[in-house]
Amino acid sequence: MMQLSGRRLPLAEIAQVALAREPVEIAAAAKKAISASRGVVEEIVARRAIVYGVSTGFGKLADVHIPSDKLEQLQVNLVRSHSCGIGRPLSAPEVRAMMLLRANVLTLGFSGIRLEVIQLLVGMLNKNVCPVIPEKGSVGASGDLAPLAHLALSLLGEGEAFFNGERMASASALEKAGLQPTDLRAKEGLALLNGTQAMHAVGGLALFRAKRLSRVADVAGAMSLEALKGTPVAFDERIHNARPHPGQRAVARHLLALLRESEIRDSHAKDDPRVQDAYSLRCMPQVHGAVRGALGHCEEILAIESGSATDNPLVFTDNGDVLSGGNFHGAPLALAFDYAAIATTDLMSISERRIDRLTNPDLNEGLPAFLAQHPGMQSGFMIAHVAAVALLNEAKVLAHPASVDNLPTSAGKEDHVSMGMTGALKLRTIVEDAENVLAIELLAAAEGLEFRRPLKAGVGVERAFTTLRGIAPRVDEDRALSTDIERVAEAIRNGQFDGGDDRL
């Protein structure tokens, strides 16, 4: 049972709730902070003070003062009017991550929301009630307004939700789960809507997958190196100690472990006329390592965000101040997602170059053209490489940063926005493309190893080869490879090619 207290949540813990449905609960200490924060708001309402988000309109309409008898309707109107998302619904894991992240930051006690509203959100999460949240419509400032509005709408028993995978009216989903919808009181609608948790959920789960891919790339690259009769000399620790980037050194160690006890290497270690391998093989530590470093940096940013108050205004219980600021602005995440997208695309790029070397008879060290047993009669992996190129092209287009764009909204009041949700959605697509490109490389490299038999590759490579052959058999004759690619990509997502005991 995960305790929610506003602490930082690592990606692995978010994934555990989003994917494995680990239950959560609000920590006892957090309940006190929540109640104290709510007390400040109720005191403001009691003395009829003019405070943004409590007794005023929103955005450009912040100068409009709302009568005290209309404060609850104001919050309901906010949720309904902002529920204008567009497109396909976010996946259940993405919505679950979004609910987790929003509940966690609300427990910090800066939002002035009642404990029972957060408890309903947690109850929905634990009982698998997932609001239907369209994926498009957020510019990432003032937070993810439209997606979070759809989330809040379900708490009211309005809109739609999935219950155990079945789409229905939110009121029905809550009833089936044994939950009651809530009302909204002063500031509570705004407390639910102001935040970065939609982009955080989508981009965070994509980043979790990208970090896994950065390890899978080592496995695929090591297998390709063996199939191409490459050398591990470039991974010697002395080289990498001379340029001690942590990711580079870790990848070099990982590759050496994967390639340990290679019979293929022993067969050509002496008197090999080749001096050094191509960059796509020789520079794996430098490239894969840089990707690891980039993704690690992005993960640190998301960890900070997971325990940060992104509401506006913020309630401070030590002296009762309610201060307007801009913590809802998604710039930190938007820049991180763009960085992760570029890094993941580069990982795809070097993988595609290795696929080309495996299939190109002028470069593949004696392997048959396109890895076909009877080239000409058979086309082998010719079009599998073309598919990888198509995916890489899409990723390169999507790697253009979303965060450098800006369009003012709310009649110029909100004149700079992050476009973080766009960045998160792009990253998700790029990661999916990368999973498929690495699946193609694994399939092609395994096929190359078949032509090196009876010699065995390194112990780590052989383990990965055995795993792959449990998913996709050798291509003895031409067949449709789409199913093989899909199955291997799914195995990548499930962690079957992370590197086993050789993971570093």
Residue ranges and their predicted role:
Residues 1-22, 26-33, 37-45, 67, ...:
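C-terminal auxiliary extensions adjacent to catalytic cores
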Residues 3-41, 45-48, 78-134, 207, ...:
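Glycine-rich, flexible loop motifs
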Residues 52-66, 70-74, 81-104, 134-156, ...:
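FAD-binding core of FAD-dependent oxidoreductases
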Residues 110, 139-141, 376:
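Conserved, non-catalytic sequence blocks in retroelement Pol enzymes and Pol-derived host proteins
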Residues 125-129, 147, 218:
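Membrane-embedded alpha-helical core segments of multi-pass
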